[in-house]
Amino acid sequence: MIRFALIAASVLGFALTAALGNFMAPLLQELERFRPQEQQEPQTPVQSRVPALGGLCLMVSTLAAVGVGWTAACIAQPTLLGSESQLMTRLLIALFGAQAFGAIGLADDAARLRSRAQLGLRRLPRLALEAAAAAAVLVLLAVNGCLPTGLQLPGAGYVELGGAAPVLWGLVLVALAECARTADGADGTVCGTAFAAMLGLMMLETRLGWFPLAVLPAALAGALLAFLLWNFPPAKLRPGSCGCLYLAGVLGCVPLCIGYAELSIPLALPFWAEGGMVLLQILYHRITGRPLFRAAPLHRWLEARGAGPVTVFYWLCALGVCGLALALAFVR
């Protein structure tokens, strides 16, 4: 019966996102027309006219689909509500973390639309908000006795980190959010790679004994599949910082809530590659005064080498599948 709950969450996530996309795509197109020309991002003329608040579709539809899916699961198996592993508590904390990061992304997108802040929120306030969201998630996990104190390392087993664990988890959440933010630019890549990650997260939660909590990645996978109807190249709607940070919140908070925070590394491999390339570019330029790469992040580098939007999409999705394979191999 729990399998039915996962299917219901996935189908509902798809249907709600498709319906919201039909409503929001023309609405956001109209809002984008009121944005002054000098505030447009330095992209191609076609890209600059693509509205970037589509992440709201993902946030709203996933939240509703998870609610329906979890209710169906609890009706089929009432013991989930009083489980010793605190399944409902962990699910609510993961949802809270994802929504909190998504709200920060929404503020970032709103800053682009309402002011002359071409790049959105300033760096320090944005990092402070992300750190606050990460701290809130960690505090909630610690208060409920769900915060992992170590991590699994290949060949070394479980390694206790003690008091350093919360600091490391917080850094991972903030770094993942920043990396995901840099990935919004190429049509379809964020949603395509996140879809592969959600499929992997469902399989991993099933394998690790957290099958009921797979309702969240199931709902989001359905929502992402529907969102690709507008986000596949050429995109008519982009997730924006709202969608990117929301997806980063899910990829960071769900593994953390089930005690396997290290899974965020392989599952979010495309995001880490995008953000890591930007970091290397900045550091190398500051040290030598010359760029290390022809362009950064990764999708810009591929475009600079002549790859078209569809080719970039497939390359990034292939990298996401590689990360999925690494994560599955990691838990064997």
Task: Give the location of each predicted region.
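Hydrophobic transmembrane alpha-helices of multi-pass small-molecule transporters
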Residues: 198-202, 278, 324
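Membrane-proximal soluble regions of multi-pass membrane proteins
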Residues: 22-23, 29-36, 270-315
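Alpha-helix boundary/capping detector
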Residues: 54, 137, 251, 277, ...
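"…together with the soluble PPM/PP2C metallo-phosphatase catalytic core" -> "…together
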Residues: 2-272
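A short, structure-level motif marking secondary-structure boundaries and short turns
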Residues: 8-10, 283-284, 327-328
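Final/C-terminal transmembrane alpha-helix of multipass membrane proteins
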Residues: 309-330
